[in-house]
Every structure is written in structure tokens, then in C-alpha cells.
Amino acid sequence: MDAFKTHLAIVASGAPLSREQARAAFDDLLSGEVTPIQAGAFLTALSVRGESEDEIVGAVSAMRARMLPVAAPEGAIDIVGTGGDHSGSYNVSTLAAILTAACGVPVAKHGNRAATSRSGAADVLAALGVKIGLPPEALARCLSEAGLCFMFAQTHHGAMRHVAPVRTELPFRTIFNMLGPLSNPAGVTAQVFGVSRPAWAEPLTRVLATLGSRRVWTVHGSDGLDEITTTGPTAVVALEDGAFRHFTLDPREVSLPLATLDDLRGGDPEHNAAALGAVLEGARNAYRDIAVLNAGAGLVVAGAAGSLAEGVARAQEAIDSGAARGTLARLVAVSNA
């Protein structure tokens, strides 16, 4: 492991790794050939200095090379966030994914159990009856028959087991909190990507572009949410076929009322599942508003809506027509078949 020690020494000195060096270092980390002390020192030094774009690209490349892939139809997207906003909000991206799929855009959702919240995507979907941890063939069938699948990160990124104990011991977030959301097993090239730190928005959008994404909205709410928020404005860095654009969204621009963080605060998986089901049954509340806003963005990124207002209107109709309820029912049925 002389090469890893060399890379560790570079990072410990405060200097950045090249993309190729980062790829090699993360190949070593994910192969289980690095001692816990070396891994902890490496991740700590990276976190203290801050990861460069080349380091993130190299690390994601190592992750993607080891992941269990899923075959997805052309035009599939993901709606995902880095987590870590400590808001305890409802499962916004999960409901937004259901609404987007109900509008005819295939969604290959990638996620995990709760880390800093009480209910992650895997937790709430399991509470809704969706079978979690399916193999790639079953996930492809979910996409084909329901227009939506949920790829459980632990199933697709088995190499993460080599660094999991070290991550648990460290009292801060590491680069791996970014790598999961950046490593979609279906290889989607369009994403609504939420970040909990505003400083991550532009560099992670460039990282996604480097890795092959074509259309991305990287979003950060003014309240700290890693979603498009309804409590105020949201900063967006958009990637559209190689061009970058910065703008701010306000929910009132698409006729949605302002909410408070308390309005968006959820609970445990059963509580959040009940709230999600209530929205699909027609409840009009802050959870519905923030979900249709994020689904509207998903439709824009997918090229299925010409504007955010059009996307929001289509997401509203997916609820009111019962299409979204049907999408979830099909996902439950197909995942358990």
C-alpha cells in the first residue's frame, strides 16, 4: 500500500490529488486494502481541507466502477439530495419522484435509510409497502411497469462496507456523503440534485457535467433544505447541454404559497408514509406544495415541461387525476411480485 501512503501524505500536506491519484486512492479504499487508521486519516485530511472537483470526480469514478448497475430506459432521471440538512422534513424527493413518474418520466431513484433524519427514502418506501433491496432485474421491471424504481444504496455499493466502520467513528460528514448521490446505478444523465451546503452547488454541478450528465438542476433552499423549498427562495445552478446558468426560484412565482419549516417537518417512517399517502389521496397542504414544486423541476430537467409553472401544473394534475396514486400502487405490486 505504498501508493496509498503516498496519496495520504499528499492530502495530509494540504495539497490536492489529481483526478488520477484520487481514483487510485479510492480504488484502494473501496477494495478493503487500507487500514482503518489510514482511511480515517485520509478522510479527515480531505474534509479539513475541502475536496477539490478533480478529487470528487476521481472518487466517483472509483465508486461507479464497483457499483451494481441497473438497466434504465432512455430519459430516466433521479431526484436526490446529499442529505445532512438536519431539517427533519417530510420525504420530499420521494414524493416528487412518484409525481414525476406519474407524468410519464421514468425515475430511477437512488437512496438509503435515514442518516441525519428520522426517515430516509428507503424507510418511508418500506413503510408504504415497497420491497427494498431488489436485484437489478427486478428494478428494471419496476421501471418498465411502474415507471419508477428505488435502488437501495447498500445493495448497489457493496464496496462501501470497507469504509463504513471508519465513517461511523468519525464525528463529521466525509466525501462519501457526496459520492452516493453522485453514483446513480442506473447511469441517469438528468438530475434534480439537492445540496445542503450552498458552496457545493456549483462545483458538484461541474462534477456531474464532467461525469456525463447533460441536464441538471442543483438546488439549495435559503432555509438550508437540500430541496427546492417553499419557505423562501432557492438558488439553482442549472446545467443544460453543456451550458451553466444561475438563477433563483420563488414558489410564489408558480402560484404556491410560502410555508414555514414547521409546516414541512415530518416524523418517523410511518408518520411520513401516512402523510405521503394523504397527499396522494388529495390532501392540500405544505407537503403537497413542496412536492409538486420539486416534481415540476424534475419534469423540466427531463425535457417533459417547457417551464417550471407547466411542470408544477402537470404534477398537480397527476395527484388530482389519481395517476400518482396508481404509480405508487404499481410500484408496490411489482416490487413484491
Curated annotation (Swiss-Prot):
Cleavable signal peptide: none
Binding-site list for Mg(2+) 1: 93, 227
Binding site for anthranilate 2: 167
UniProt-listed Enzyme Commission number(s): 2.4.2.18
Record: residues binding 5-phospho-alpha-D-ribose 1-diphosphate: 81, 84-85, 89, 91-94, 109-117, 121
Residue sites binding Mg(2+) 2 per the record: 226-227
Named cofactor requirement(s): Mg(2+)
Cellular component annotations (GO), alphabetically ordered: cytosol
Listed GO biological process terms: L-tryptophan biosynthetic process
Keyword hit for Magnesium: yes
Cofactor note: Binds 2 magnesium ions per monomer.
A molecular function GO annotation: anthranilate phosphoribosyltransferase activity
Top enzyme category: transferase
Matches recorded under SUPFAM superfamilies: Nucleoside phosphorylase/phosphoribosyltransferase catalytic domain (SSF52418), Nucleoside phosphorylase/phosphoribosyltransferase N-terminal domain (SSF47648)
Record key words, sorted: Amino-acid biosynthesis, Aromatic amino acid biosynthesis, Glycosyltransferase, Magnesium, Metal-binding, Transferase, Tryptophan biosynthesis
Reactions it catalyzes: N-(5-phospho-beta-D-ribosyl)anthranilate + diphosphate = 5-phospho-alpha-D-ribose 1-diphosphate + anthranilate
Pathway given in the UniProt record: Amino-acid biosynthesis; L-tryptophan biosynthesis; L-tryptophan from chorismate: step 2/5
Residues the entry annotates as binding anthranilate 1: 81, 112
Keyword Glycosyltransferase on entry: yes
One Pfam family named in its UniProt record: Glycos_trans_3N
Function of the protein: Catalyzes the transfer of the phosphoribosyl group of 5-phosphorylribose-1-pyrophosphate (PRPP) to anthranilate to yield N-(5'-phosphoribosyl)-anthranilate (PRA).
Assembly information from the UniProt record: Homodimer.
Protein family per UniProt: Belongs to the anthranilate phosphoribosyltransferase family.
Name of the protein described by the UniProt record: Anthranilate phosphoribosyltransferase
Species whose genome carries this gene: Methylorubrum extorquens (strain CM4 / NCIMB 13688) (Methylobacterium extorquens)
